[in-house]
């Protein structure tokens, strides 16, 4: 479980998170949605311990984040940021194996190879990471995070992803979310991601959090949260919300 209680964070007089309280029980894919500047990435950084709130508290497995050591926290949660540039000529395989650093147990070549296959990175193994496309880099970073969290026996872990599909083609978007769902069901992973694609969130997320101006304005199942009224108010766009006949999830269409 991860929880946030009364999170407040301000920058240059502007509240980026404004008294945010949330509890994610686990066993879910959570999608945080909202317009640009809503506070989504700021909230994610606070939930992961990268950004200390001005007031309020975050807890992971009922323990305050500031009471975790850096090493132990890294074994239980992993974070993909929006940008993951590197200045040095590491190979893809070397980048992925960096994920094992908190465990100090060597490279674990078998697990690394398994995870590279899961993330469709085998063909990239010997490439210079800096020469990859944005989408290829996102796949490599996901593999690094899984190597960081992987244990021989599945145990609860948290995976935080900030716009993980921003550079992915449609095939790899689908592959990513199918993999995340598999990890939730088979490996006791919990996933929290910031997204802009409303239809991806509607199709794959178990829980949707809507943010506006630093506040959480809705939190619940996609069919309860992604309504035409709520989305029109939030984004100021002319849209129609239909029902996907395949799975009864919301289907968001931009009007002409």
UniProtKB/Swiss-Prot annotation:
Q: Which residues bind ATP?
A: 34-41
The GO terms this record gives for MF are: ATP binding; ATP hydrolysis activity
Xref: CDD domains: ABC_Iron-Siderophores_B12_Hemin
Cellular compartment(s): Cell inner membrane
Q: Which SUPFAM superfamilies match?
A: P-loop containing nucleoside triphosphate hydrolases
Q: Which UniProt keywords apply?
A: ATP-binding, Cell inner membrane, Cell membrane, Membrane, Nucleotide-binding, Translocase, Transport
Q: Which cysteines are joined by disulfide bonds?
A: none
Q: List cellular component terms (GO).
A: plasma membrane
Q: Where is the ABC transporter domain?
A: 2-238
Q: Which SMART domains match?
A: AAA
- Say if the entry is tagged with keyword Nucleotide-binding: yes
Look up and give the membrane topology term. Peripheral membrane protein
Q: What is the uppermost EC class here?
A: translocase
Q: Which InterPro entries match?
A: AAA+_ATPase, ABC_transporter-like_ATP-bd, ABC_transporter-like_CS, P-loop_NTPase
- Give TM segment ranges: none
Q: Does the keyword Coiled coil apply?
A: no
Entry EC number(s): 7.6.2.-
Relate the assembly described in the record. Answer: The complex is composed of two ATP-binding proteins (HmuV), two transmembrane proteins (HmuU) and a solute-binding protein (HmuT).
Which family is this protein grouped under?
A: Belongs to the ABC transporter superfamily. Heme (hemin) importer (TC 3.A.1.14.5) family.
| Purpose | Part of the ABC transporter complex HmuTUV involved in hemin import. Responsible for energy coupling to the transport system.
Name of protein = Hemin import ATP-binding protein HmuV
Taxonomy of origin reads: Bacteria, Pseudomonadati, Pseudomonadota, Gammaproteobacteria, Enterobacterales
């Amino acid at each position: 479980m991860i929880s946030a209680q009364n999170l407040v964070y301000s920058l240059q007089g502007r509240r980026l998170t404004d008294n945010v309280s949330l509890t994610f029980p686990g066993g879910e894919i959570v999608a945080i949605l909202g317009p640009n500047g809503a506070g989504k990435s700021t909230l994610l950084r606070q939930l992961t311990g990268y950004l200390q709130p001005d007031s309020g508290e975050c807890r992971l497995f009922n323990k305050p984040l500031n009471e975790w050591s850096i090493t132990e926290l890294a074994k239980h949660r992993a974070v993909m940021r929006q940008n993951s540039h590197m200045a040095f000529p590491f190979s893809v395989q070397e980048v992925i194996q960096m994920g094992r650093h908190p465990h100090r147990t060597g490279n674990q070549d078998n697990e690394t190879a398994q995870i590279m296959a899961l993330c469709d990175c085998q063909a990239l193994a010997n490439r210079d990471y800096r020469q990859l496309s944005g989408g290829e880099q996102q796949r490599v970073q996901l593999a690094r995070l899984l190597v960081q969290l992987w244990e021989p026996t599945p145990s609860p872990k948290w995976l935080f992803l900030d716009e993980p599909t921003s550079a992915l083609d449609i095939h790899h978007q689908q592959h990513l979310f199918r993999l995340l769902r598999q990890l939730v069901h088979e490996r006791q992973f919990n996933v929290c991601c910031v997204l802009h694609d409303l239809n991806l969130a509607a199709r794959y997320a178990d829980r949707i959090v809507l943010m506006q101006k630093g506040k959480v304005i809705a939190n619940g199942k996609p069919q309860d949260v992604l309504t035409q009224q709520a989305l029109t108010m939030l984004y100021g766009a002319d849209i129609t919300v239909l029902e996907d006949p395949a799975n009864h999830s919301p289907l968001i269409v931009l009007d002409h």
